[in-house]
């Protein structure tokens, strides 16, 4: 019997998305941050603040490569570094087959899903497993130390492959981009840091309103929000003629006056009336996700 829970090899993007989301949780966020980032001997808040300061100019205009992508990549690497650290701290108490299962469940099955292993890689992995099986269970620490370091180096190179990293990053981003509570918490976290930087005179002024929004961003926000006002849920999908365009408002979730940015993650669709009423107030989303449809028997009974 394996000492590890069976994990779906398809759940890596969900796992990373969950870690990123949990890192901003009011009650448990600091615990998640510490759990994964103390290995790097880095203070999460200090690192985040330094990153925002370094890339502040990029938050002034919408870019397809968002700040959230960098945030995701940090958790992507921190997650695997965490697995490696605790494995190396305890593996000599394990059975050989459990060691092999660990690598298969945590690394190999996931790399296979993304077609990140070629025939040469598979042969190398099998040769490593053969060394494991031929080792002395009574003296694992001494016998396998160099082999494990070589194996983790191999896995690290695979995980750092840009094509794989960007693919997983896009999957995680897609999961988080539809989560309104996360977007509010994430944008508010950034806004608080930006206000702090302004107070410390590390930046001259807050982000200003852009002269225009690129069509790719408008399309993304419109289709993500199902052409629906995110406050009153008015259907705006028919408001696409020149006469009706003023009814569509691409609102900053966290107002610029309160430290908000022009990062794509800080926009939502509102109708003209709701946008006017919201003004520069902070307003949490009424729904975490946009419904595809409402079931009649549950309508008005559930808060999503």
Walk through the language-model features, giving the residues of each:
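Histidine-centered nuclease catalytic patch
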Residues: 234-269
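Short, Lys/Arg-enriched, disordered terminal segments
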Residues: 1-4, 289-304
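Short Fe-S-cluster ligation motifs
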Residues: 260-273, 277, 298-304
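General structural signal for secondary-structure boundaries
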Residues: 174, 183, 214-215, 282-285
């Amino acid at each position: 019997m394996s000492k590890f829970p069976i994990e779906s090899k398809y759940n890596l993007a969900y796992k990373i998305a969950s870690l990123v989301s949990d890192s901003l949780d009011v009650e448990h966020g600091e615990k998640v941050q510490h759990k994964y980032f103390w290995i790097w001997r880095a203070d999460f808040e200090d690192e985040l603040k330094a990153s925002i300061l370094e890339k502040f100019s990029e938050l002034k205009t919408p870019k397809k490569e968002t700040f959230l992508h960098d945030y995701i990549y940090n958790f992507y690497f921190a997650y695997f570094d965490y697995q490696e650290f605790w494995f190396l701290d305890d593996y000599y108490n394990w059975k050989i087959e459990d060691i092999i299962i660990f690598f298969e469940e945590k690394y190999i099955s996931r790399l296979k899903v993304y077609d990140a292993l070629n025939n040469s890689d598979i042969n190398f992995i099998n040769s490593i497993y053969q060394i494991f099986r031929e080792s002395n269970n009574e003296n694992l620490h001494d016998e396998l130390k160099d082999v494990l370091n070589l194996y983790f180096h191999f896995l690290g190179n695979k995980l750092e492959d840009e094509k794989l990293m960007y693919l997983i990053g896009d999957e995680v981003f897609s999961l988080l981009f539809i989560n309104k509570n996360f977007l509010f918490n994430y944008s508010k976290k950034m806004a608080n840091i930006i206000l702090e930087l302004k107070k410390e005179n590390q930046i001259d002024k807050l982000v200003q309103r852009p002269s225009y929004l690129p069509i790719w961003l408008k399309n993304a926000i419109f289709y993500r929000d199902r052409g629906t006002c995110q406050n009153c849920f008015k259907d705006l999908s028919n408001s696409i003629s020149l006469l009706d365009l003023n009814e569509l408002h691409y609102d900053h979730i966290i107002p610029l006056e309160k430290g908000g940015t022009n990062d794509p993650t800080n926009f939502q669709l509102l109708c003209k009336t709701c946008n006017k009423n919201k003004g520069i107030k902070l307003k949490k989303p009424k729904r975490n996700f946009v419904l595809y449809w409402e079931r009649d028997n549950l309508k008005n009974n559930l808060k999503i």
